[in-house]
From Swiss-Prot:
It comes from the Bacteria. Belongs to the universal ribosomal protein uL5 family. The lineage of its organism: Bacteria, Pseudomonadati, Pseudomonadota, Betaproteobacteria, Burkholderiales. This is one of the proteins that bind and probably mediate the attachment of the 5S RNA into the large ribosomal subunit, where it forms part of the central protuberance. In the 70S ribosome it contacts protein S13 of the 30S subunit (bridge B1b), connecting the 2 subunits; this bridge is implicated in subunit movement. Contacts the P site tRNA; the 5S rRNA and some of its associated proteins might help stabilize positioning of ribosome-bound tRNAs. Keywords: Ribonucleoprotein, Ribosomal protein, RNA-binding, rRNA-binding, tRNA-binding. This is Large ribosomal subunit protein uL5.
Amino acid sequence: MTARLQEFYKEKVVPELIKQFGYKSVMEVPRITKITLNMGLGEAINDKKVIEHATGDLIKIAGQKPIVTKARKAIAGFKIRQGYPIGTMVTLRGQRMYEFLDRFITVSLPRVRDFRGVSGKAFDGRGNYNIGVKEQIIFPEIEYDKIDALRGLNISITTTAKNDEEAKALLNAFKFPFRN
């Protein structure tokens, strides 16, 4: 059973983008390859439980176990030694990716306080989109009573688009709520 957004991509988005950009092959049409959720935890230096709580939150949000990212080199100013755990990240591909994107667009983004749409300028020049979430409680899987602290996370959407214009058209076709 494929995800709802995956079927929507094949049936509606691909023909729409072929018509808009004049692609000759279906394989030329940009698609989302992966979504990476990253939670940087600077406060984990003092308290090791922070990593456990953040990992638990990401498991609930993504539906799979994240990896703990470690410091590549020591930075005395931040009191970090090489190998210290400083964050968690999870990479979603395939069906889980489409299911997460569906939940994110339809349920989570409207729950953001004072939400007026996401910025259309957060593309990196190579067709990838980044969005920062200030609080993990916008996700319905996170119970407000059971969190220890509000943490933000970075969501990176990687596409096969050659430029930002194609990537924005792809995300617009997925009904991504851009404000500009």
